[in-house]
Amino acid sequence: MERIGRINRRKIYYVQIRNNTEWKFSLPKNDWVAFTIANKEDEQLVPPAAKICMDKNVSYTCSAGTLAHWTEQYFDEEITGRAFDYEMQTKQEFDYESSPITTAHQNFNEGFWFATTLAHDAHKEIDKVVCLDFTKRKVKKHLTELIDKINNGWLPSDEEIELAEYDN
């Protein structure tokens, strides 16, 4: 995992998931935002990554790429499954207030801006955003450009759909 910048008090990290078996060991242990970037060809990588993020106590997930809504839905299903398991084991009602919040963004730039500036948890301070890049073509360069723009007052467009710019 590589630190690629900072926005206000949040440190921004980037990790390429594809062909990188070590990525999961570098994730924070708690209180962090996952900004996921996944496209159709990355679908098989999402389920195990969602489980790992949940195991690492992710506080918020913001999903982008052509699989944004599917990725968000998968995180929601993982949360629900864990809640069900908790209720079956403890015979107590699960407190969804302690669950991660999930969002999907068809506008890539807006999603990154949201993850780095607005995503929050009322109960804990979030000071890390980890960009989990599932793609073959990589978006690291685009993310570093967005960090500079956001730090200089840039706001995302109102376009409903805006795709990522890829490194290659």
Residue ranges and their predicted role:
Residues 2-168:
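ATP-dependent carboxylate-amine ligase
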